[in-house]
């Protein structure tokens, strides 16, 4: 996404490392299996249409979902995972790769959802899934597969999503309209030793929810709590203006153009995947997967900026806001508040060719694997940004776009001034890796591996310098071919980089007794910036990025309890970010590089105290902190905005996390379950000035296996019906602790908890 958000996403990812690090040992005697369980990855309190983000204490890596061993998308901006992948009936398997496995096979650190497409099987088989909720969601997923004779097999899939969201918006009846189609043909050969599959996938998605649910107004009380602003209901009232049209200046051509927000967020993908596997007589197994994807990726943001109180003493006579009524007549706006928003229209044409091949050999006490990645990614990307102002209605009605007649005669202004982006070119990664999973004795298991990667980046961006050697930066009506105030012409600047990346991982488990033992692992990654980091109007820090992760602890297993307790450390150097700092009505970009580190302790337990009852418990204490987080910028009125967050707790990240997951089999066919997640106090800006109190995310439901073909379930999201804000507060980066002490009962905007939702699902085996 735009670099406006990069610092925020880095902060959001920094500290939840310990929440998930121990699950592998707590749930599986084979501590070095590639996947781990009990992560409830599809229980997402932030979204109804994708897997939850499992945070590991660092900025999110792009490769967070794999299908058939390859990334669903090489880069998630502008082509997000949810627009081309869903956890639907087309998948034969979904799991969660461990951190070490993700690091070795993809070069990124973090968990990755690991999925495989359903291939054809003997006879005729089918699955029809249906999902709905009380807001009107209609989701259908169908897989049909079978054999054609002579070892030929087929599989076809269809996914349709009609999701109106949790509130109505004027621009479209759906906040998510996604359709995905897959068709596979498989041939088994040489006595079933080999298997070749060709797959075609087409996806078409409008991810309106990305901007529709981005923010909402509330009253910040001052003690970490919030209350509703008038009749505006968080999560069930729209904060989008009625008007769906957006005027922008094309970053490539400089022309003023118009589009609808719905059209701007169109994502399309056309993919061909070839998969082959073969089992040799000597026990050697070979597999290879090649994917080509031609797509249009798009992400739209409507980012809230400053809020102005038009009726305050300081603003009397300063503004003259107008709007147009339903008849097109110009009228004076007499509301109390207006909010400035920045529209970011991110889009790019993408071609990617991804190839992975592996050789695996099992020995009596170990398994050895040798693999290779050849991943090529080409993109022509830009982000067109536009500023506009809107009303902040207290009566729960739809917001109106307004304009200040003292300054302009139309809604839109400052085209491409604040967060516009451009880059074009290719990135290539060629990597070799190996892993060895070795039972040294019946008490000691070792897992180790390494990856060597050559990263090549070639293309152009708009990081233009003037005659003095300083970056020109963005300005109003900025675009390729524009001329800055100092006479510098904005022409694409060439980019060419070649880097050697590497990582290694080692894990050990020692069984002191049959039930008790020690476990630990260490993963170290050296990376360099990805192509998307070059999107802003300045070059990023291109020094190496180091990511060490170390964990050590104990485990205990018996017939009814599996328990692990671990201490952990994780850090990352040279995070690139751009803060869009606000002072009055002015917004300025401040590029920076900083480090993050997290220490913590976690205990994870899975218990089966009596027949039919299971209980999962997770407790984490952690301290995520910023390092070298300093920047400053001078505004036009001479005010200097300084930020020094070094040593501060990372914004938006709790220090205490708790997960409670009880379930009970009422009968052999009916399961009752709940899931509770507690997140303690979080800071809402990097200066620790604003904060939100802790909250619970809750889920519960009943699963009923009616017969061997039909399964029904009912799930309640947020059954405690907690409402409130979370994340960060718009435009608050420069607010200090001392300034915040006097701020009480003030209107602000930010993200919010997913509202109470009742979901119904049915799955039919055909």
Residue ranges and their predicted role:
Residues 164, 626, 651-705, 720-737:
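C-terminal beta-barrel architecture of Gram-negative outer-membrane proteins
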Residues 173, 186, 195-273, 298-344, ...:
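Acidic/polar loop-and-plug regions of large Gram-negative outer-membrane beta-barrel proteins
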Residues 252-301, 338-383, 416-445, 493-511, ...:
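Outer-membrane beta-barrel transmembrane strands
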Residues 350, 367-377, 382-386, 390-408, ...:
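Structural signature of Gram-negative outer-membrane beta-barrels, strongest in the C-terminal barrel
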Residues 442, 560-562, 566-578, 589-686, ...:
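Gram-negative outer-membrane beta-barrel transporters
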């Amino acid at each position: 996404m735009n670099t406006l958000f990069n610092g925020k996403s880095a902060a959001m990812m920094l500290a939840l490392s310990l929440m998930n690090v121990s699950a592998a040992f707590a749930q599986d005697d084979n501590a070095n299996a590639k996947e781990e369980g009990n992560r409830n990855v599809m229980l997402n309190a932030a979204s109804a249409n994708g897997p939850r983000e499992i945070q590991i204490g660092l900025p999110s890596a792009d490769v967070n979902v794999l299908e058939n061993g390859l990334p669903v998308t090489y880069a998630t901006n502008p082509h997000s995972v949810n627009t081309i992948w869903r956890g639907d009936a087309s998948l034969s398997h979904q799991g969660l790769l461990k951190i070490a496995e993700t690091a070795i096979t993809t070069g990124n650190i973090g968990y990755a959802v690991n999925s495989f497409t359903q291939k054809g099987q003997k006879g005729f088989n089918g699955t029809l899934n249906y999902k709905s909720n009380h807001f009107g969601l209609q989701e259908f997923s169908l897989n049909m597969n079978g054999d054609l004779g002579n070892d030929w097999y087929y599989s076809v899939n269809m996914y349709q999503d009609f999701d109106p969201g949790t509130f109505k918006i004027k621009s479209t009846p759906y906040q998510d309209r996604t359709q995905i189609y897959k068709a596979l043909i498989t041939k088994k050969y040489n006595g079933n030793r080999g298997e070749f599959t060709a797959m075609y996938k087409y996806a078409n998605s409008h991810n309106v929810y990305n901007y529709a649910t981005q923010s909402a107004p509330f009253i910040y009380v001052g003690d970490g709590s919030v209350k509703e602003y008038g009749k505006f209901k968080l999560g069930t009232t729209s904060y989008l203006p009625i008007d769906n049209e957006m005027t922008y200046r094309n970053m490539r051509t400089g022309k003023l153009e118009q589009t609808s927000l719905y059209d701007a967020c169109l994502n399309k993908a056309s993919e061909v995947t070839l998969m082959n596997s073969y089992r040799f007589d000597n026990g050697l197994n070979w597999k290879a997967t090649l994917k080509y994807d031609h797509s249009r990726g798009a992400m739209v943001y409507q980012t809230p900026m400053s809020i102005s109180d038009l009726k305050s003493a300081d603003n009397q006579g300063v503004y003259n806001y107008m709007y147009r009524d339903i008849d097109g007549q110009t009228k004076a706006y007499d509301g109390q508040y207006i909010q400035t928003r920045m529209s970011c229209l991110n889009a790019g044409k993408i071609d990617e060719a991804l190839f992975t091949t592996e050789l695996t050999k099992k020995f009596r006490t170990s398994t050895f694997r040798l693999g290779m990645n050849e991943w090529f990614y080409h993109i022509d990307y830009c982000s067109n940004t536009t500023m506009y102002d809107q009303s902040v209605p207290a009566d729960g009605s739809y917001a109106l776009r307004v304009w200040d007649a003292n300054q302009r005669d139309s809604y839109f202004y400052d085209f491409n001034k604040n967060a516009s982006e451009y880059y074009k070119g290719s990135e290539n990664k060629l990597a070799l890796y190996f892993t060895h999973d070795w039972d040294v004795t019946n008490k000691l298991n070792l897992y180790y591996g390494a990856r060597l990667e050559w990263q090549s980046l070639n293309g152009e961006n708009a990081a233009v310098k003037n005659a003095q050697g300083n970056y020109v930066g963005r300005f109003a009506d900025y675009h390729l071919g524009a001329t800055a105030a100092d006479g510098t012409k904005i022409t694409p600047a060439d980019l060419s980089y070649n880097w050697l990346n590497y990582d290694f991982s080692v894990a050990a488990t020692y069984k002191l007794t049959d039930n008790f033992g020690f476990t630990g692992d260490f993963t170290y990654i050296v990376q360099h910036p990805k192509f998307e980091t070059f999107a802003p109007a300045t070059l990023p820090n291109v020094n190496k990025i180091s990511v060490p992760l170390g964990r050590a602890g104990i485990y205990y297993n018996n017939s009814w309890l599996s328990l692990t307790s671990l201490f952990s450390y994780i850090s990352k150097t040279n995070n690139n970010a751009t803060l869009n700092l606000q002072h009055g009505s002015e917004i300025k970009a401040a590029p920076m590089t900083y480090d993050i580190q997290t220490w913590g302790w976690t205990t994870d337990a899975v218990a089966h105290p009596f027949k039919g009852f299971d209980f999962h418990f997770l407790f984490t204490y952690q301290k995520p902190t910023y390092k070298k987080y300093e920047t400053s910028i001078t505004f036009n009125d001479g005010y200097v905005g300084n930020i020094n967050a070094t040593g501060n707790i990372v914004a938006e990240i709790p220090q205490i996390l708790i997960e409670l997951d009880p379930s009970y089999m009422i009968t052999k066919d009916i399961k009752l379950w709940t899931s509770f997640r507690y997140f303690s106090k979080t800071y809402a800006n990097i200066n620790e000035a604003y904060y939100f109190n802790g909250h619970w995310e809750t889920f519960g439901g009943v699963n009923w296996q009616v017969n061997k073909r039909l399964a029904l379930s009912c799930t309640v999201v947020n059954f405690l019906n907690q409402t409130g804000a979370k994340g960060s507060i718009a435009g608050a980066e420069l607010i200090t602790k001392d300034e915040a002490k006097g701020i009480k009962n003030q209107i602000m905007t930010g993200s919010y908890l997913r509202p109470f939702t009742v979901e119904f699902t049915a799955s039919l085996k055909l």
